[in-house]
């Protein structure tokens, strides 16, 4: 029967095989199960094997080994955590980071693993060596960190917000001025005057945008929101800036969702100057003007496909046409990306409008219901109808001298309403001659006979 060491060796080799292009969690869980059988001895054995695998020149072997380290540290108890956070193992990881032979992808994965384990071990002071290595990485190799630390949410005063906005606008203005100057120096003397005029226009443009500030930013990293008011996004997403909420947090909109995001995760997008917009428009018009030539070239190639391309290659007109059409291919690709992005933006804007309209209509419905008039009910003093149709009821009334008298009244007479503007008067002003609303003891006079 094979020993535990032999089983662990086979399991580790399978989980860290260089032929694997992704982590095989079935193999990784198998290693964890073997370590749990004997944590004291198996922890040391498996870490020695992982150290040897990390010494390989194969990047895939090293990446699979790092994934195995994280799984073992999170699932195999305190003994293995001590092995992972020992000075010996953290020293091996530091040597890999300093080595020039290790691929950059592996170094970034090491920094990611150290960050994850440091967060997992921070509640145990005996495992602080991993936290020390994480601090060293942030200080010495900040470029290896895929995601920066989120800044704290500190309120910003009105004066600070004004000063920061002015400083930002000055930086943008200086950047535009330097860009315009570099274009003027590269252009010849024939277009120097036109460049100067464009430069003056470029100086006026930032002054008009000062009140609006930065309108859009591009995400530098992925961000998965941990709180309800935060905005999730992916690297490369363009976020529309709405307002500044905290010192280092802004509120923005992306794909119809609104939330706050940290500034160190994004970079501002400067709006194109009038000269750049005009140049892009000219390029687009030039690409679209070649549409007919592309159709002609395609037709020639289809006709020549049955005869052979050897004769077509000797045709000067075909060669000239091909050389004219080929250079527009990268511009076509760029335009496809541009309009695809604009399409996504318009779809997102449409969704925002639909949500806003739905919310607005819901608020109107609530307001209408809160101010609706209740249904008019019969006066509480109206007598109930107890007589059958045609039955003559005897009603007794008290007169002014204290005597009682009876009147025989049919149902038609009992509920007859006088025609003299009865319905146009409020109940308090209606005539007291309406017999159906008389009660004994209310009026001193008996009702009249109709």
Curated annotation (Swiss-Prot):
It is a peripheral membrane protein. It is found in: Endosome membrane. Residues 15-145 form the VHS domain. Residues 147-167 have a biased composition (Basic and acidic residues). InterPro entries: ENTH_VHS, SH3-like_dom_sf, SH3_domain, STAM, UIM_dom, VHS_dom. Keywords: Endosome, Membrane, Protein transport, SH3 domain, Transport. Residues 163-182 form the UIM domain. Residues 197-209, 394-432 have a biased composition (Low complexity). One of its GO terms (cellular component) is endosome membrane. SUPFAM superfamilies: ENTH/VHS domain (SSF48464), SH3-domain (SSF50044). It holds the Pfam family VHS. Its main location: membrane. Residues 212-271 form the SH3 domain. The keyword Transport applies. Belongs to the STAM family. Component of the ESCRT-0 complex which is the sorting receptor for ubiquitinated cargo proteins at the multivesicular body (MVB). Component of the ESCRT-0 complex composed of HSE1 and VPS27. This is Class E vacuolar protein-sorting machinery protein HSE1. The lineage of its organism: Eukaryota, Fungi, Dikarya, Ascomycota, Saccharomycotina.
């Amino acid at each position: 029967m094979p020993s535990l060491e032999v089983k662990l060796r086979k399991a580790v080799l399978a989980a860290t095989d260089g032929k694997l292009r992704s982590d095989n969690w079935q193999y990784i869980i198998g290693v964890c199960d073997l370590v749990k059988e004997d944590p004291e001895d198996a922890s040391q054995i498996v870490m020695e094997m992982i150290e040897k695998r990390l010494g390989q020149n194969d990047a895939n072997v090293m990446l699979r080994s790092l994934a195995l380290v994280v799984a073992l540290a999170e699932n195999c108890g305190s003994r293995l955590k001590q092995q992972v956070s020992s000075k010996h193992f953290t020293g091996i990881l530091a040597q890999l980071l300093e080595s020039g032979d290790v691929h950059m992808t592996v170094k970034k994965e090491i920094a990611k693993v150290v960050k994850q384990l440091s967060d997992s071990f921070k509640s145990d002071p005996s495992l602080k060596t991993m936290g020390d290595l994480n601090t060293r990485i942030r200080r010495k190799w900040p470029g290896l960190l895929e995601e920066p630390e989120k800044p704290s949410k500190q309120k910003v005063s009105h004066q600070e917000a004004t000063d920061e906005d002015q400083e930002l606008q000055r930086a943008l203005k200086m950047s535009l001025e330097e860009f315009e100057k570099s274009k003027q120096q590269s252009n010849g003397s024939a277009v120097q005057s036109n460049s100067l005029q464009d430069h003056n226009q470029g100086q006026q443009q930032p002054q008009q945008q000062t009140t609006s500030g930065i309108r859009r930013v591009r995400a530098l990293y992925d961000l998965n929101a941990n709180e309800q008011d935060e905005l999730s996004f992916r690297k490369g997403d363009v976020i529309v800036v709405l307002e500044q909420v905290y010192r280092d947090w802004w509120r923005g909109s992306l794909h119809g969702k609104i939330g706050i995001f940290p500034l160190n995760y994004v970079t501002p997008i400067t709006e194109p100057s009038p000269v750049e917009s005009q140049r892009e428009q000219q390029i687009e018009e030039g690409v679209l003007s070649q549409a007919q030539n592309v159709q002609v070239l395609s037709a020639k190639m289809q006709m020549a496909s049955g005869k052979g391309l050897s004769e077509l290659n000797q045709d000067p007109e075909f060669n000239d046409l091909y050389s004219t059409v080929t250079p527009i291919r990268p511009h076509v690709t760029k335009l496809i990306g541009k309009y695809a992005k604009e399409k996504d933006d318009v779809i997102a804007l449409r969704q925002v409008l639909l949500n806003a309209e739905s919310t607005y209509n819901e608020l109107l419905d609530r307001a209408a219901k809160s101010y609706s008039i209740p249904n008019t009910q019969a006066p509480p003093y109206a007598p109930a109808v107890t007589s059958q149709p045609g039955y003559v009821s005897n009603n007794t009334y008290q007169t002014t001298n204290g005597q009682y008298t009876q009147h025989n009244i049919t149902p038609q007479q009992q509920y007859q309403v006088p025609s003299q503007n009865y319905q146009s008067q409020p109940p308090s002003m209606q005539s007291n001659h309406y017999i159906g609303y008389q009660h004994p003891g209310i009026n001193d006079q008996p009702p009249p006979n109709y």
